[in-house]
Amino acid sequence: MEVVGTKFLYGIKVHLSGDTFDLCPADICKTTGGQELQRSACPVDAPKSGLKVEGYTPPDEIIHAIERIMQEAGIEVGGVEYIIDDRDGRLYYYDINALSNFVADGPKVIGFNPFTRLVDFLEKEAA
């Protein structure tokens, strides 16, 4: 889940298969429909994982928790990753970043370019 101005901007859901785990879901190579993503911000030789990603809006209570985490940490732009344990349904926030790693090819995955929103925020802050 990514935030700008401590407010929820967008989320992505990574569809894992088996026992795989990916610490950088922004670099996933395909949408859930199988469409290849433009990955200009990723290393040229990055291996393709075969994992699939889609835009996702979590439940309101998770959005509020993520916004609260970022506000309490004093992080205006960044990301929070979480996972729900299939064994017991518990929610775990496992990665809080003060630097956002926006999803590759935002328009295809989430329907807009998150960098545009980031630039708008930074211009407003600089004014």
Q: What are the language-model segments listed below?
A:
Residues 1-73:
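Phosphate-binding site of ATP-dependent enzymes
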